[in-house]
């Protein structure tokens, strides 16, 4: 980002700062930015990437957004200039007032390598995806499902969770492993008591919840004893009520923990 002179336009309907016309990219000064969280669902992604925000969807919460879902024209090229527009709308829907310029400018901030030494070291010394494509440009659970089942069974938003218990019935990588005589476990880091993958794939894996989804302490024992299964998947702690062990940062993220 540094040195690229990036910015996003300020929509004319913004109550504060519209006379500035654009919000330039700047270095973040707050580790809790933006707050509240930016829009995650796929119709927010439409606005963020194409700067299309249907008038009836402006300032609407996720459950109130309607067709055509801020969809861009067919074959449109992403302009990447709708992050400010979407954040002003999302902030207003959640807080009940439009944000000040200083509040919505947070959406155009990022961190330097010096501010994030651990992540920077990992990026410098190991493989990094610099062209990553989300199977569903939406929230976490659908992309977790694609990771382990290559589909989300047509589900495109997280809520309601009840959909996971009945509709996401696609075959999983875990079942394929069993078909080839391979063993597997999902190790869930404490204090989380439930596995996200167990919930996401409940229709297919409900009979394995008691045997193949275990606490992370068991991973430590298996590793020490040399008895790890053929396939191990570790779910880091991502509870908003405790310190996290992943960049997922509690409940406020749209990407899977890895």
Regions inferred by a protein language model and the residue ranges of each:
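N-terminal pro-sequences and low-complexity stem/linker regions of secreted or lumenal proteins
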Residues: 1-258
